[in-house]
C-alpha cells in the first residue's frame, strides 16, 4: 500500500504543475479575461484576469461531460438513460439550447454525450448530471462541485450542469483551463471533444425522428474565414449575461495548449482574440524540455480509519516542461510542496498543488 501511495503522489508531481506567477500575454480590450496553459503540465503561459469570477455559460458542460465520461469509463455500448420530468421541464421558459428530449425517452449514453457536446443541449446536460449524480440533477451538481474541490480550484461554483447564468454559478479562465485539462484524462472525453463530423442520433422509443448534430464553432470549420487549423476541439458558450465564452484544445508541432476566453462582447471579438492568443503562444513556446530529477524528497503522513497508517517518501521524478524560446532548464527551479497528510480515497481527491515551478 505504501509503495502504491508513493507512486500515486509521484505521478501527481508530473501532472499537477502550478502556474508561473509572471506569465503575461497580449493585452486584450475586447475580451475581459483569458488564460493559456500547457495541456500536459498545466503551466500558465499567458493570462489576463485569469482568476476573475465570471459567468461561464455552456463551457460549464466541459465538467458535466468529464464526469459522465469518468463514470462510464469508456463503456458506452448498451447503456441507456431515461429522461426524467425535471430534465425537460426545469428548462421551461429559459429559451435553452436542446435536442428535444421527451420525458420517458430512453436515450443511449453516447447520444446524450454527443448531443450535449455538439448541440450544447441543456436537456442532455441534465440527463448526464442525473447519470453521474445518483439519479438527480442536484446530485450531479454536487458531484461537479466536489470535483472542483478535488482539483484544488478556488474560483468556481456550479449551480447547474448546463451553464444558464445565475449569481451562484461562476468560474474563472484559470479554473476552466484546469477543468478541461482534467477532463481530457477521462476515457472517451477527447474523442467527444474533438469530433468534427456531423453526429446522427437514431429515433428512440418516443421520438420518431432522426436528429442531427453539427459543429457550430466557426474556428473549426475549414470553409470559414475564422478557421484556425491548430484547434482540435472546443466548447462555445453564450448567454446575455455571460456574453461569449470559449475553451479549446489546440495543437501545433507537438505542442498542446488549452486556451480559455471569457466575456467577449461580440462573437467576432472572440474569434479575433483566440487567433491572437494562439498565434502568440505557438510562436513563443515551440518545444518541450526535459528537466531531470533534482533529487528532492519529502514525507507524507498517510491517515485513515481514525488513525495514522504510516508515512511514505516521495521523490522528485523530473518533469517535462514547455519553456518559452530563450529559456533553458537552467533558468527553472523546482520545489516540492507536499500536503502534510494524505487520505487514500481516490486519485482525483488530491489537491493539485504538489509541484511549484518558479522561473528565475
Language model regions located:
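A general lysine-centric signal
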Residues: 2-3, 61
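Sec-dependent N-terminal signal peptides of Gram-positive bacterial secreted proteins and lipoproteins
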Residues: 4-22
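Active-site-proximal flexible loops/turns
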Residues: 9, 45, 65-68, 244, ...
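Hydrophobic alpha-helical membrane context
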Residues: 14-15, 73, 277, 285
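Short secondary-structure junctions and interdomain/linker hinges
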Residues: 15, 120-123, 284-288
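Active-site-adjacent loops and short helices of periplasmic peptidoglycan-processing enzymes
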Residues: 21-174, 178-187
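Domain-terminus/edge residues, biased toward the C-terminal soluble/receptor-binding domains
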Residues: 153-154, 167-170, 174-360
Amino acid at each position: 500500500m505504501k509503495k502504491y501511495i508513493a507512486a500515486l503522489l509521484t505521478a501527481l508531481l508530473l501532472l499537477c504543475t502550478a502556474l508561473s506567477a509572471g506569465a503575461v500575454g497580449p493585452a486584450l480590450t475586447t475580451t475581459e479575461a483569458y488564460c493559456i496553459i500547457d495541456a500536459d503540465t498545466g503551466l500558465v503561459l499567458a493570462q489576463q484576469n485569469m482568476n476573475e469570477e465570471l459567468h461561464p455559460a455552456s463551457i460549464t458542460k466541459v465538467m458535466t461531460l468529464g464526469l459522465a465520461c469518468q463514470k462510464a469509463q469508456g463503456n458506452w455500448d448498451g447503456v441507456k438513460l431515461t429522461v426524467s420530468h425535471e430534465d425537460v421541464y426545469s428548462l421551461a421558459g429559459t429559451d435553452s439550447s436542446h435536442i428535444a428530449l421527451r420525458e420517458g425517452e430512453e436515450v443511449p449514453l453516447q447520444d446524450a454525450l454527443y448531443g450535449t457536446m455538439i448541440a450544447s443541449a441543456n436537456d442532455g446536460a441534465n440527463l448526464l448530471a442525473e447519470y453521474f449524480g445518483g439519479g438527480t440533477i442536484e446530485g450531479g451538481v454536487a458531484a461537479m462541485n466536489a470535483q472542483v474541490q478535488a482539483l484544488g480550484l478556488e474560483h468556481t461554483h456550479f449551480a447547474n450542469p448546463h451553464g444558464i447564468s445565475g449569481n451562484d454559478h461562476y468560474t474563472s479562465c484559470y479554473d476552466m483551463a484546469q477543468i478541461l485539462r482534467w477532463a481530457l484524462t477521462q476515457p472517451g472525453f477527447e474523442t467527444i471533444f474533438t469530433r468534427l463530423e456531423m453526429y446522427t442520433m437514431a429515433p428512440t422509443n418516443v421520438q420518431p425522428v432522426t436528429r442531427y448534430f453539427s459543429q457550430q464553432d466557426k474556428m473549426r470549420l475549414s470553409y470559414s474565414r475564422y478557421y484556425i487549423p491548430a484547434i482540435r476541439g472546443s466548447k462555445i458558450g453564450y448567454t446575455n449575461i455571460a456574453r461569449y465564452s470559449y475553451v479549446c484544445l489546440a495543437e501545433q508541432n507537438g505542442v498542446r495548449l488549452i486556451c480559455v476566453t471569457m466575456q467577449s462582447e461580440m462573437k467576432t471579438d472572440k474569434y479575433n482574440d483566440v487567433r491572437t492568443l494562439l498565434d502568440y503562444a505557438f510562436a513563443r513556446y515551440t518545444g518541450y524540455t526535459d528537466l531531470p530529477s533534482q533529487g528532492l524528497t519529502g514525507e507524507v503522513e498517510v491517515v485513515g480509519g481514525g488513525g495514522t497508517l504510516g508515512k511514505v517518501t516521495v521523490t522528485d521524478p523530473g518533469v517535462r516542461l514547455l519553456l518559452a524560446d530563450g529559456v533553458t532548464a537552467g533558468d527553472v527551479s523546482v520545489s516540492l510542496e507536499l500536503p502534510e497528510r494524505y487520505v487514500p480515497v481516490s486519485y482525483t481527491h488530491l489537491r493539485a498543488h504538489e509541484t511549484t515551478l518558479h522561473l528565475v
